[in-house]
Amino acid sequence: MLPALFQCGELERRLNLFDATMIIVGNIIGIGIFTTTGLIAEALPDAVMIIAVWIIGGLLTLCGALTYAELGAAMPRAGGEYVYLKEAYGPLYGFLNGWTYFFVINPGSIAAMAIGLIFYLERFWPGVSLERNLVRISFLGQSPKLSTGQVMAIAIVFFFSAINYCGVRAGSLVQNVLTVAKLGSILAISVLGFMIGSGSWNHFSSTHTLAGPADFLGQLSLAMIAVIFAFTGWFTSTYVASEIKEPQRNVPYSIIYGTLIVMGVYALINMAYLYALPVEQMKGVINVGETAARALFGSSASVYVSLAIIISILGAINSIILTAPRIYFAMARDGLFFQGVAKVHPRFKSPANSIVIQAIWSCILVFSGTFGQLLTCTVVAMLTFSIMTGMANFILRKRKPDLPRPYKTHGYPWIPAAFVASYLLILANAMVSRPKEGLLGLAIVGLGVPIYFFWKRKITARLA
């Protein structure tokens, strides 16, 4: 039990299994599924291998989902990974996770998606553009520009933050609508593509000679990195575990069901892409979703794909804004963040201050334009935290054998071991391929160490 000093109201359990599952599906499916396959085709130019790598990536993600499901059921509290790392390794490691997600990963992701959304909104609203400047501001010898696109991106961040400020039910209702809409649009593109599209099943025939074992493993590794990151977000319901009804059941099942739904959707849409285009025409194509739609339905179809992407990005933005503030809220409850962030809104029962501080920082990143570089540097940190969380399953089984576990990982210890091993390989590849960014990412995490001890001293002083 935490000191009363840090207790400022309680979050309420208002989310059911459907809500929690839609949060996960909405978070995972962003823009990646519309852009990643072209990059995979460049690494593995074979239709069967492309489908196989998506299935393998989905199965590895499912291993992670089953691993996190046990932790989420055993510790259904706000914060997700922050809670599990704190329990397994100590408060410093939990704090470093929360610090990195607050300082870079979550606000940076929100900023990146909000800016990415502008590229698609321009098609329907030409006045909103990152190239159309409203004002140039002189500050410390620099002259940053504020464009209409940045203003719209900031407005989008504040709009969804305001919705979630008004309570988890309001945020989850919007999430449900956006997630169902994005699933519907992806299914429509896929099914109609097979039914009435101008594609060919001959595109699935293998005409490419695979490289030797060493080169093939390198190509497979590059493709797997892209796939794994297209599945990022499969554990986000754990952040709102303290607001989910029957959490011992609904938290693990939301993770598992959400991952399985996305696996099915990803497999289907990739089959539609391959039905539309031969692999040679997909290699290196970033906007593979639009390219496939034009091949299936004609040039005008790209408009509908753009709409699907807009809906998809909006759903992913709302999902992060809904879930991520619970991490900082949990940190503040432990005295490791600003005390005001620990407060629950008396009427809306939301972590209101946590939502506000995330919105402000996200908008600063939108304005500064530095989020892209920061996110690139934190890939290694994200992988490291996931590996540590997977290992926490083993540690807590030994250290806390009496901890109630309403759900236990199926296939233990092989399933968690497969998850940890696969992520270790991906981490090694990331460090080898981008050592500078990897080291910078670890440096960002390391910056949290002195900040942790600063907060720890503040706790000691308050409780003295």
Regions found by a protein language model. Give the residues of each.
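C-terminal membrane-solvent junction of multi-pass transporters and transport-like membrane proteins
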Residues: T148, G340-K349, S386-E437, R462
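TM-loop-TM module centered on a large, flexible mid-protein loop between adjacent transmembrane helices
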Residues: V83-Y84, G90, E122-R132, H208-A211, ...
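Membrane-interface "cap" regions at the ends of multi-pass membrane proteins
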Residues: M1-G38, E42-A47, T61-L66, M75-A78, ...
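Membrane-interface loop-to-helix entry segments
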Residues: T148-G199, T232, I255-I256, T378-M388, ...
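Hydrophobic alpha-helical segments and their helix-loop junctions in multi-pass secondary transporters
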Residues: I118-V128, V180-H208, I228, M271-L277, ...
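Hydrophobic alpha-helical segments of multi-pass membrane transport proteins
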Residues: E122, I186-I189, Y328, T378-R405, ...
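Hydrophobic, membrane-embedded alpha-helices of multi-pass small-molecule transporters
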Residues: L15, D19-F34, A153-F160, G193, ...
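Hydrophobic transmembrane alpha-helices that form the core helical bundles
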Residues: L39-E42, W54, L62-V157, A162-Y165, ...
